[in-house]
Structure formats: C-alpha cells, structure tokens
C-alpha cells in the first residue's frame, strides 16, 4: 500500500514535540486548506515529565518527526481535545510508524492501560 494514496490519511508537518506521545502539527486538508492540531499517538503511552525515560521518549519522537513531513491517520479525539492518531514518517526512504517504533524501542510507560498491541 502506498501511504500517500490512502484515504483518510493526511499529510502534515510536525511543528512541535510536546512529549513522546503528543505532537503539534499543521495538517494539509486539501484545497489549499490547513489546520493546526495537537495529536496524541493512539495505543501508546510514554513517560510524563519527571518519570523515568521521559527525556529518551521525547527525544526519540523529536528525532523522528520534528520539522518533518509526516502522514497522519486520525481517529476520534480524546478528553483533552487532542485527536488520536497513527503517525508515519520517512526514515532512509522507508515509511515507518512512530507508534510502532516507540514500542519497539522500549520507550513506553510500563504497565499503562493505554499501551495496546
């Protein structure tokens, strides 16, 4: 599947990394329309400020997507008004899923109910 041609996946740019699982983006909605949104990565929960591995998870997310063109598959919004999303990015000409990579790198908060397989 070519991610650029998939329905319901938006192209955007990550403008800020709040923490390992929350980013700010400018979404390209098409027809010369864009929107700024805060996204929460779906099915992953990284450590919060002051917790072990907060800096590592945040820096990993920054390295992968900050300032980069990304692809975003959105779901519903959460109780804080952030859209839940899967975020895809290019790494060495390979499309990667940030949500999956945070899991693979072992950067999730242990025993969190929000971490799903």
Regions found by a protein language model. Name each.
Residues 1-117:
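Small beta-barrel nucleic-acid-binding modules, primarily SNase/OB-fold domains
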């Amino acid at each position: 599947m070519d991610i650029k041609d998939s329905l319901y996946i938006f192209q955007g740019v990550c403008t800020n990394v709040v923490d390992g699982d929350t980013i700010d983006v400018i979404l390209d909605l098409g027809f010369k329309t864009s929107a700024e949104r805060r996204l929460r990565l779906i099915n992953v929960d990284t450590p919060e400020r002051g917790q072990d591995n907060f800096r590592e998870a945040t820096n990993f997310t920054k390295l992968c997507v900050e300032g980069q063109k990304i692809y975003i598959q959105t779901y519903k919004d959460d109780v804080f008004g952030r859209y839940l999303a899967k975020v895809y990015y290019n790494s060495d000409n390979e499309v990667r899923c940030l949500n999956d990579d945070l899991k693979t790198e072992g950067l999730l908060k242990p025993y969190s109910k929000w971490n799903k397989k």
